[in-house]
Amino acid sequence: MHILTAGVDEAGRGPLVGSVFAAAVILPETFDLPGLTDSKKLSEKKRDALAEMIKNQAVAWHVAAAGPEEIASLNILHATMLAMKRAVDGLAVRPEKIFIDGNRIPEHLNIPAEAVVKGDSKIIEISAASVLAKTARDAEMYALAQRHPQYGFDKHKGYGTKQHLEALEKYGVLPEHRRDFAPVRNLLAQQALF
């Protein structure tokens, strides 16, 4: 008998702005999607196409997030674990086993779970979750770029690139910026001195 297995992965731990996203995906036993691998190894166009196919074919899937305020109050690791738990809790079908990318398991899942280092390249359910989390994170950055085009979020996706750091200095810190991340925190501290 097929065991209902969910894969869980996150996207957006490193950027200076926005939420950290997590996805949980249960795939059918017969699922086959050529080219599905760790989302970081895929082009954006390929990720977007795969995301639609995953959503259409999955037994269940759910994407969840933890916002900048939660990241600031909990720290990025605990906020990531919270987003992962929300993703699992949001599944319409309860899995019998969960595989989580990385080396940590969120608390209180109440389902047998296993952390798998580099799982997004080893386990297809985690690869699928990786794609859904990354496309959701990118969508947040495109929406933010619409509201604040001068920051270039559509290009750097919120990471601490030269363009982003220059925009931070020139235009200031947005409510969506992660105030506990060093480049943002340091800029706010400098501004407080003047």
Swiss-Prot record:
GO cellular component: cytoplasm; ribonuclease H2 complex
Subcellular location: Cytoplasm
Annotated transmembrane regions: none
GO BP terms in the entry: DNA replication, removal of RNA primer; mismatch repair
Keywords tagged on the record: Cytoplasm, Endonuclease, Hydrolase, Manganese, Metal-binding, Nuclease
Cofactor(s) demanded: Mn(2+); Mg(2+)
Reported function: Endonuclease that specifically degrades the RNA of RNA-DNA hybrids.
Protein name as annotated: Ribonuclease HII
Lineage: Bacteria, Pseudomonadati, Pseudomonadota, Betaproteobacteria, Neisseriales
